[in-house]
Amino acid sequence: MQGQAEQKAEPAARTPAADELVSYDPSTGKELWSAKLGDAPKEVAAARTAWPEWAAHSNAYRIEALRRFANVVRKEEAGFAELIARETGKPLWEAKTEVASVVNKVDISIEAYAERTPQRRMEAALGNKVAVRHKPHGVLAVLGPYNFPAHLPNGHIVPALIAGNAVVFKPSEKTPATGEFLVQCYHEAGIPEGVVRLLVGGPDQGRSLASQSGIDGLLFTGSARAGMALHKQFAETPQKILALELGGNNPLVIWHAKDLDSAATIAVQSAYLSAGQRCTAARRLIVPEDDHEPLITAIRKLLDRMVVGQPFDDPQPFMGPLIDAAAADHVQEQWLNLMMKGGKPICRLERPDGQKPFLTPGLIDVTDVRDRPDEEIFGPVLQLIRVKDFDAAIAEANNTRFGLAASLIGGSPEMYDKFWANVRAGVINWNKPTNGAPSNAPFGGVGLSGNHRPSAFYAADYCAYPVTSSEADRARASIGEGLRDPNMQED
């Protein structure tokens, strides 16, 4: 399948037209893709027209269509992974895992729909029969992120389609080519073009889509700031569903781990996979004051060996560039801010080529920094915090407005029980990284990390609404109290 994305020779220097969106390869700076900006009212109208017929089909019909979609993605796996690698800069090996996740999401969503939104019939009081079934909302808008431009929006779109909704999907303006390719896969599988619409554009088109009266809800993955803006906007439309999957300032507590090499490996995986551009990436490493130096030495040795490079290099790098120069600039500014506040670099964050968004992994001790910013540093930066005891470690883990992921490495079962009971997060792990959440479980956070609409296995919950019905074969009714006897005469 051939989309509009091509390898183009020209650099990113040309100025796009006012009505055009251009995507660039972050590892080279060259133009990758371009298209005209879309029209949100037009796309919503098309989805509204197509929705009733799609909703009228049986679940089995829609499930079969999604299974065909999975087969299309399998067939296009190599080209899809290459496109993701080019547009995001992530290594090809990682792009391949994303394509595999797109495929796996179908069977997981089918299972989730059956488990979370089944038809149920029950007996109520006095022999009454009760049925619980679910209906689709209608037309759902999906706003996708750039870090997993296929997997994360697909995690909204597939369960929405199974439930009988139509979708208008606006990919991130930084990864539109991947979004277009994903939509083409739905269409090639025989899902009507009106049922899955692609809206090309940037923030203006996203705001326009969110404001359309013709949508029945919006499913968003992105920053807390954008999520809060959507939350305020949708406060005036409580009849519309809003699911927010936001970021995190995630703690990784390593407490007297017996296997230092494994603990260091988990720390590196948690903090630096995808160049730190994961909402579940570890941002804060919390360790005991009296027993941390051997661990830090082990982490430094891994960081010294870490390869940062182009997505198609052979051998493959551990991580590629950030999504663009602006993102790299922002992470560098956040790093410098920590240093200005008294942070002590252990492994310095560096930018080998100032014109490109490649960053080396940074590790900085911020124990003595006052007023540490409670923000998501969306890049390869890990902040070390030394504490006196395990209670202080838990308090530090909770020292954030976010609440997405947290992990404890080491400790005892009793300590993990205490950690689990007292840490406020939607994902809490033991001896596992903060990232890599399983798709057959709910995924979401509390605080500024979401609005209590977890995705993954629980996405079925926000893609359909329950309808309770009391039912009988024929009407039988009587009024037992409060009526005069018809045979009695009034005085």
What is the role of each PLM region?
Residues E31-A35, T49-A56, V142, L252-W255, ...:
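Short, well-ordered beta-strand elements within core beta-sheets of diverse protein domains
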Residues A166-V168, P345, V427:
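A short hydrophobic/small-residue beta-strand
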Residues M1-K129:
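N-terminal Rossmann-like NAD(P)+-binding subdomain of aldehyde/semialdehyde dehydrogenases
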Residues G217, R225-D368, W430, S478-I479, ...:
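ALDH superfamily catalytic-core signature
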Residues P118-S262, Q316, V387:
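Rossmann-like NAD(P) dinucleotide-binding subdomain of oxidoreductase/dehydrogenase enzymes
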Residues G29, R62, I84, V106, ...:
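Residue-level signal for inorganic ion chemistry
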Residues W51, A55, A70-E77, A81, ...:
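Structural signal for hydrophobic packing residues in well-ordered secondary-structure cores
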Residues D25-S34, I215, R351, F358-D491:
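Conserved C-terminal structural/oligomerization subdomain of aldehyde/semialdehyde dehydrogenase
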